[in-house]
Regions:
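Alpha-helical transmembrane segments and their helix-start/interface "positive-inside/aromatic belt" motifs
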Residues: 1-3, 90, 94-95, 148-162
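Transmembrane helix-loop junctions in multi-pass membrane proteins
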Residues: 12-21, 49-57, 112-119, 140-148, ...
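Hydrophobic alpha-helical transmembrane segments of multi-pass integral membrane proteins
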Residues: 28-55, 200-206, 223-248
């Protein structure tokens, strides 16, 4: 929450005061610069606010600021560094293989949503995203240790910047030093409060499901050919994928692949990301956010079942 406040206030204030830089940024790129921002940053780590400032097209804000940031942006800047540094070594290969499944299906859903939103030059704007997915897949399978180091450094830089920006926000709030504007500080207070309510509600909902539907969960897990821990992990991921991390080592192999694949797009769909998106955008964007993330997450799960079935047949 601290880093969210820092990024939101400082990044928007900076962009407000440097609009000429943003206007010239597109002159050096063959694609919309918001695509690059959305592919590298989570929505609540500055991704959405930066995209909103640099893009004049409301549909591109939905595409890059809402969808890209909440899928591949969140995966790169938040999920991968945390999981790769906290999972047991034996679980990392299964996790990375699942992430690969999630990355493979993600462009399919994004292209369909882009067509629905009528994004100009969609396939040209998809080039950097496709290249980024290919690079990630290549890094994962060629040199996993180096990939972990690079992503960890990137995530730590984002985290440190977030805390530094929050410190500057605090200085401005008390001493009016001009690092940001007071209206942004008041606005971010409201955003964080709404996020907290939604996250708390989603966690309570998950606990109620686990408490009163444990038998149904066990039966459903048997039908899906995964163990109970894997199914619980999927349910928890709807709120936050971090909640399923302690369960990862207890999952069966297929369950690990499914949870990792789903986390690329489906994680946080009813958690903090939903709270943030609902706070800063309209109901249309929020609806697209939920439908697209769930669709990509479910498609990733189906991809895992398809490939594991073929392996068993071979």
């Amino acid at each position: 929450m601290l880093s969210i406040s820092g990024f939101y206030c400082i990044s928007i204030a900076f962009l407000r005061n440097n609009t000429e830089i943003l206007n010239h940024l597109g002159d050096f790129l063959f694609f919309d610069p918001s695509i690059l921002i959305g592919s590298l940053l989570a929505p609540d780590l500055g991704g959405y606010s930066i995209v909103e400032m640099i893009s004049k097209d409301p549909n591109m804000i939905v595409f890059a600021g809402v969808l890209l940031t909440s899928t591949i942006g969140a995966t790169i800047s938040f999920q991968l560094p945390i999981f790769l540094n906290n999972l047991e070594k034996d679980d990392v290969p299964s996790f990375m293989q699942g992430i690969a499944y999630g990355l493979i299906v993600l462009p399919i859903v994004l292209i369909l949503v882009g067509l629905f939103l009528q994004i100009d030059s969609l396939m040209i704007n998809m080039i950097p995203l496709l290249v980024l997915c290919i690079i990630l897949l290549f890094m994962f399978f060629i040199n996993l240790k180096l990939s972990v180091k690079i992503l960890t450094i990137f995530a730590n830089m984002i985290r440190i910047l977030g805390y530094l920006f929050f410190f500057l926000v605090c200085l401005t709030f008390f001493f009016d030093l001009g690092f940001t504007q007071q209206d942004l500080i008041q606005e971010v207070f409201s955003i964080v409060f709404q996020m907290t309510l939604i996250v708390a509600g989603s966690l309570v909902l998950c606990q109620l499901i686990l408490k009163y539907f444990s038998l149904q969960i066990e039966k459903l897990a048997t039908m899906l050919h995964i163990n109970q821990y894997a199914l619980i992990g999927l349910i928890l991921s709807l709120g936050t994928s971090i909640a399923m991390m302690p369960l990862f080592s207890k999952m069966d192999t297929k369950g690990k692949l499914i949870n990792a694949a789903f986390s690329v797009s489906g994680a946080y769909v009813f958690g903090g990301q939903l709270g943030f998106i609902a706070s800063v955008s309209n109901s249309f964007s929020t609806t697209i956010f939920i439908i697209a993330k769930l669709s990509a997450g479910i498609l990733a799960i189906l991809m895992v079942y398809l490939f594991t079935k073929r392996r068993m047949e071979n």
